[in-house]
Amino acid sequence: MKGSEYALLVARETLAEHYKEVEAFQTARAKSARRLSKVIAAVATIAVLGNVAQAFTIATMVPLIRLVPVYLWIRPDGTVDSEVSVSRLPATQEEAVVNASLWEYVRLRESYDADTAQYAYDLVSNFSAPMVRQNYQQFFNYPNPTSPQVILGKHGRLEVEHIASNDVTPGVQQIRYKRTLIVDGKMPMASTWTATVRYEKVTSLPGRLRLTNPGGLVVTSYQTSEDTVSNAGHSEP
């Protein structure tokens, strides 16, 4: 046989020393792996606790069930800006929100169409303080003989067009409008009216009502008077 086919003899003392070195190396690696696992677990725990704390802080500062309206407007240079509070809008933008909301209230209260009567009834009721709401509902509901439901039903309608809005005092606005009575088979009859609206701004309005009342307005007093003499139309209390 050739010499390369024979294994080299290793002294027993040398072999024992080699085994000790291998065992010590493996033990050191195992300890290092355990330490690394503990560090990773600690970092993961801290990250989870941090995320939980952050989520709790956000939920406390901004309740998730709260609906916050965002107002958008176009600046003179063409850029778009936004704000979440009416009181922090530029004066002209806050006035625009108030004017639009009050006009929508008057328009739906003074107009009538059988197809949209329920929507108008609900919005006007939600916009109104308790006493104003009661007066409106007593006027509009059956069996009041002056209610447009009784007089017009599905055979006519009242159309309302805006003329002007003017602030009388803080929290009081007068709105002039044209109202046209249209009855099937008859000539339309137009008249002009003025509505005097007293209102307040509230911050505790439920989220569902903010969708149709972003300004948070509540009408506390409402009166109408006819400007022109006409045999068409009427005014509720």
Swiss-Prot record:
GO biological process: protein secretion by the type IV secretion system
Highest taxon of source: Bacteria
GO CC annotation: plasma membrane; type IV secretion system complex
Membrane-side (Periplasmic) residue stretches: 62-237
SUPFAM superfamilies: NTF2-like
Residue ranges annotated as Cytoplasmic topological domain: 1-38
Primary localisation category: membrane
Pfam families, sorted: VirB8 (PF04335)
Entry keywords, A to Z: Cell inner membrane, Cell membrane, Crown gall tumor, Membrane, Plasmid, Transmembrane, Transmembrane helix
Entries under InterPro entries matching the protein: NTF2-like_dom_sf (IPR032710), VirB8 (IPR007430)
An MF annotation (GO) of this entry: identical protein binding
Regions crossing the membrane: 39-61
Assembly mode: Homodimer.
Recorded family membership: Belongs to the virB8 family.
Function statement: VirB proteins are suggested to act at the bacterial surface and there play an important role in directing T-DNA transfer to plant cells.
Name of this chain's protein: Protein virB8
